[in-house]
Amino acid sequence: MALLQLEGIGAHYPGAAAPVLENINLSLGPQQLLVALGPSGSGKTSLLNLIAGFVTPSGGRITLDGSAVEGPGAERGVVFQDNALLPWQDVLANVAFGLELAGVSRSEREAKAREMLALVDLIGFEQRRIWELSGGQRQRVGLARALAADPRILLMDEPFGALDAFTREQMQELLLQVWQRTAKPVFLITHDIEEAVFLATDLILLAPDPGRIAQHLQLDFGRRYSAGESARAIKSDPGFIETREQVLASVFAQRAGEQRA
């Protein structure tokens, strides 16, 4: 059964000539890792912002566990590309920050923060300052902070976009490990086709003007990694390469159609 349901969702910003999104129908349930891919202007970030409750749809309905989404909530954890960490706090305090705002006792929130740091392989970094961390380590802290509140679903806005290729692949592997261990549904947006194909159980390709779902693919490469196959072996597999090229061709077709319009 779906935890998150989007029915006929549209988004139209004041002053815009056309809708940003139109007639989006989606569901997200247990053991799903849903990835949205598309060219700039296809509404990927707008879609995530609607699910997060940062903006209100102009049409349609978003529900989580049957209740309407009407604003941000702790049941939706968000990880951004710009991780928005607090540079004057150490790693432990950053991970525990949301719990502190929620009134959780210091001993409880620090215990939970340490548990999440273990999950993202950052034990021993508790007292480090944010400026002492690499880009990948900062994203691990951001992921741990989002998970500390025990959200029902995890929303990720191009979380690995600013990382180098080696660190990006490490973070992709870490995300799949966390996804497998926590069983939390994930909605992630990216510009990276290989990343999308590798991670997704469900991949939606968004077309622009207005943003709409052009394709919905069901994939199993991430599940294969979770079952013990290496990332390098999967990404070198002929089936993976063929799927990646098919998705790339679809993206180019969307861009060509946009230019002709």
From Swiss-Prot:
Summarizing the function annotation, the protein's role is: Part of the ABC transporter complex TauABC involved in taurine import. Responsible for energy coupling to the transport system.
Q: What class of enzyme is it?
A: translocase
User: Main location per UniProt?
Assistant: membrane
Recorded catalytic reaction(s): these are:
taurine(out) + ATP + H2O = taurine(in) + ADP + phosphate + H(+)
Q: Which family does it belong to?
A: Belongs to the ABC transporter superfamily. Taurine importer (TC 3.A.1.17.1) family.
Does rRNA-binding show up as a keyword for this record?
Answer: no
UniProt keyword Cell membrane present = yes
Q: Where is the ABC transporter domain?
A: 4-233
State the Pfam families in the record.
ABC_tran (PF00005)
Its EC number is 7.6.2.7
Query: What quaternary structure, including any partners, is listed in this protein's UniProt entry?
Result: The complex is composed of two ATP-binding proteins (TauB), two transmembrane proteins (TauC) and a solute-binding protein (TauA).
| InterPro entries with a match to the protein in the record | AAA+_ATPase, ABC_transporter-like_ATP-bd, ABC_transporter-like_CS, ABC_transporter_ATP-bind, P-loop_NTPase
Kindly provide the name given to this protein in its UniProt entry.
Taurine import ATP-binding protein TauB
Localization annotation: Cell inner membrane
Keywords of this protein's UniProt record, alphabetized?
ATP-binding, Cell inner membrane, Cell membrane, Membrane, Nucleotide-binding, Translocase, Transport
> Quick one: a GO cellular component term?
plasma membrane
Tell me the CDD domains matching this sequence. Answer: ABC_NrtD_SsuB_transporters (cd03293)
Molecular function via GO:
ABC-type taurine transporter transporter activity; ATP binding; ATP hydrolysis activity
Residues recorded as binding ATP, renumbered to this chain, are 38-45
What gene, per UniProt, encodes this protein?
A: tauB
Membrane topology per record: Peripheral membrane protein
